[in-house]
Amino acid sequence: MIPTKPHDVIWTDAQWQSIYAKGQDILVAAAAGSGKTAVLVERIIQRILRDDVDVDRLLVVTFTNLSAREMKHRVDKRIQEASFKDPNNEHLKNQRIKIHQAQISTLHSFCLKLIQQHYDVLDIDPHFRTSSEAENILLLEQTIDDVLEQHYDKLDPHFIELTEQLSSDRNDDQFRSIIKQLYFFSIANPQPFEWLNQLAQPYKEENKQQQLMQLINDLAMIFMKAGYEELQKSYDLFSMMESVDKQLEVIETERMFITKAIEGKVLNTDVITQHEFMSRFPAINSKIKEANEGMEDALNEAKQHYDKYKSLVMKVKNDYFSRNAEDLQRDMQQLAPRVAYLAQIVQDVIQSFGVQKRSRNILDFSDYEHFALRILTNEDGSPSRIAETYREHFKEILVDEYQDTNRVQEKILSCIKTGEEHDGNLFMVGDVKQSIYKFRQADPSLFIEKYNRFSSSGNESGLRIDLSQNFRSRQEVLSTTNYLFKHMMDEQVGEISYDDAAQLYFGAPYDEVSHPVQLRALVEASSENSDLTGSEQEANYIVEQVKDIINHQNVYDMKTGQYRKATYKDIVILERSFGQARNLQQAFKNNDIPFHVNSKEGYFEQTEVRLVLSFLRTIDNPLQDIYLVGLMRSVIYQFTEEELAEIRVVSPHDDYFYQSIKNYMIDEKADSRLVDKLNRFIQDIQKYQNYSQSQPVYQLIDKFYNDHFVIQYFSGLIGGKGRRANLYGLFNKAVEFENSSFRGLFQFIRFIDELIDRKKDFGEENVVGPNDNVVRMMTIHSSKGLEFPFVIYSGLSKKFNKGDLNAPVILNQQYGLGMDYFDVNKDMAFPSLASVAYRAINEKELISEEMRLIYVALTRAKEQLILVGRVKDEKSLIKYEQLAVSDTHIAVNERLTATNPFVLIYGVLAKHQSPSLPNDQRFERDIDQLNSEVKPRVSIVIDHYEDVSTEEVVNDNEIRTIEELKAINTGNEDVKIKIHQQLSYDYPFKVNTMKPSKQSVSELKRQLETEESNTNYDRVRQYRIGVASYERPKFLTQTKKRKANEIGTLMHTVMQHLPFREQRLTKDELFQYIDRLIDKQLIDEDAKEDIRIDEIMHFIDGPLYMEIAQADNVYTELPFVVNQIKVDGLTSEDEDVSIIQGMIDLIYESDGQFYFVDYKTDAFNRRKGMSDEEIGNQLKEKYQIQMTYYRNTLETILKRPVKGYLYFFKFGTLEIDD
């Protein structure tokens, strides 16, 4: 029983009902800004306070973890407040304890807890972990590799047909992409295999094909009838004209055709497919114009109606009936086995992927849902015993953002709720008009089905409550939004009727100052009048709107009833995507306005990130021209376009630019300076390649950053803080990647490529807080749930993305899979019945979701809403005004063929302000007759860019004469003096800039060796090219023998951890020790065969091992960084102030004396007659400089004499001479 609402409460009647109604399933349709979160919290509190329900017996499901934390905090706060008011209430005391066990979480979190408690039902290891994003992406890719490999081995005829249709000559990327899409679609269903198995049914069953034909017929009929009306208008106008017999003859022919085509309830598809238009409509010549003087506009209008008719019929012919019905149905039969085989491949992927995850003991988010469902259901799909216990435990289940659930989540909820809809305990809150996550497999039809089934009385099934009062926005925003959607959204296009229950009602305590919505149409300047593109012009125009807000607008404080000046943080720019972000950033920078792109996209497009990725791709495989040349052209290596052209010209027919570099370097006519530059570049590449063989990706990135001062350089540019954060972000992602079960540069690059392909960005690293005074740009998706005083909704002229509609395979969650028919023999593809039908359905659903995105964008605004669209000329605006009207809405065909949001928005809002529009193209004759809730309050402004632009066109490439330059500088002696001082300045520490600030001991060794030979070391370094040919890429190499330097690193790793004890290690114990290194992942398992066991045993059996084992203290792999001045005994006035860094293999202390040991895996040639002493002297001489630095460094640090040994595994111990 709902309690009587007191007069002094803040809740509306609908909110009050939402808080207290119970006894059946309840769906609360909460419009934007209607206070649904407050209602949800209050309902939880009242269930605790009024009904004595324990908080841990409520299951509250939110959409995000952040929402869950905020919800839990609010509930906890309210419980504490109630407890303070009634300190003796034991029930409230218990709630303060139980709140910590309360199930207020995302559904994924609930599923995870369920699995942790009932893992025994699933027969899985309880110590499972959640896979990282990188791990999951790469493992799925690997699984698809394996499954396709199996099918390539079988070469089933249907598989061959699929590969012929879905793969290109170069790769099978499209085929793989379709498999992945099908995988994600299928697992969004409670029974993925069942969903996949039914995909082929429409291709086999005639009754299903008839249903598809009827669906196509119904859609095509809409366009044909609209075409008939356009043709009739054309006929009526031409009938009033003189000398238009030819035009009327054509129109009469078309009238006969379309009358025959649309007679009856079913279209005559044969007539449509066979119909051919005249190649050209008879021209409106000067004779006709003279005969109809003063009626030129009517002539043009008549022709426009005919053109519109033709375009509508052509759409039907091309999109729906390009082939006759018999051909469409015959192709379905031939496609059936092909579709069934594709479904089988996806089933194989699901099974194999599951096995791969189990072998690694990992779960992903889809596993959470499906494993939870296995726990909660029996084999027949009925609720399990465990589900019954949860039903008994939870008094109520509350679901937030219900419009964003999918079929799997719906099934989980149905298992743990009690009763049927008329007596259940499920409370759902959401707004289907804000369902904008179809790309995540959210299914708004679940909400719509319940919305239509439930009633406001709740007598027949569940109870439906509409929360429509908006407490966020001014009246002008709400009424204009209502007017727009009442004429744009219905069940046909939009999937829900925007009726009185769905519309927004004003509820915020604003003053009565008018703030009309601004609908701004920017007419582009031509290329003759502006150097800027249309997008750049729009960005500048938006800046002007921001300036106007800051200079002239105020923000109303509803609590105090006072105004304050608008600030930058009050303003948000909303767009469909981040495509315009770069232009906006530049425009705001040019005007010194603080601006931040709140981006979850665009990370990989950042200059600094692209540089690092080009570097990584080049290191992995320099035979990729785009990345190799990109790296060469970058700020790091600074090759000019002229130099690159010079390299290419020498051997223009090389397959790869890397080959051109090699050929250029040996060309007799090559520029020696360019060859030197190339040598340094190649040396760098090979150095990093060698490093990447033994080090993880994040260390390779870190080395690149340090070697080339990448962080420092980008930090000094505009936006340096964000750039630095982006670089560190990539490094951190590489660290995360290494923590997965995948390793190596190739796999990391593959992970990045997958993220890019999926348009799943890391997001630019956010360096701006919520209170920073900046103008923000964000996508509509990321703005959901937020509000701003001023919203500039721009980019309205950007076309809807209908690219997926052109794919050879169309997927729909409800209907299944539509595949084009591909004739293998003719190598030609044709639309099939299924692909035509599902393409039309998806187009309709796409427009519906775009409408919902418009709704979300408009309802973010509190004070004022500014809509910005862009057109080439004003003729487009007239065309939008004239969109056909059907009853109270824009005609269905106009909505389905709309190319962008601006067509719809301007087409609705401009009609009532157009003085010349005929009544049949209006919604009403007088908007003043409308009630306040739907009366549009909109100011339409048409601006030509030339009229509003402050752009100053400056050509920096202008060639000026000496005389002009002299004239500019005449009489400006002070400037001349300052310029001379700047240009002639001599840096006092120039020598130091020629030397690195930090050098390794190995680098110093090479430098001193060359300088002692009277050779410049920098010159020598240019020619350290290494191997002449490039190895095969890693992914093409089956087995690979380790190089000498890799074996050296491996031996050092073994020695680093080698235990020293007086009872020497046996050979078996050494093998056990190496196995432990493998278990700890310190070395790879396949490395075991490359470890020189006998050489290590020789060391263990030798005297040096025993001396170390008996030492007082032993330190291994000791790093050091020391000032070279101190090591070399220089004075502080000496020019070279470099820092030396290095790593000493082992140091031990015996009786107060320190010794260091450096292991060497060098091979050497014993010439005939050479004694051991001669070989020893040769080896000591080779490492004399390095050992001297080691000893001097240790003596500098320890302040005492130090002795040292070189240990050669192939020779033995050598003591370092004093």
Curated annotation (Swiss-Prot):
Residues 9-474 form the UvrD-like helicase ATP-binding domain. Gene3D superfamilies: 3.90.320.10, P-loop containing nucleotide triphosphate hydrolases, PCRA, domain 4. Coiled coil: none annotated. InterPro entries: AddA (IPR014152), DNA_helicase_UvrD-like_C (IPR014017), DNA_helicase_UvrD/REP (IPR000212), P-loop_NTPase (IPR027417), PDDEXK-like_dom_sf (IPR011604), PDDEXK_AddAB-type (IPR038726), Restrct_endonuc-II-like (IPR011335), UvrD-like_ATP-bd (IPR014016). Its cofactor is Mg(2+). Heterodimer of AddA and AddB/RexB. This is ATP-dependent helicase/nuclease subunit A. It comes from Staphylococcus epidermidis (strain ATCC 35984 / DSM 28319 / BCRC 17069 / CCUG 31568 / BM 3577 / RP62A).
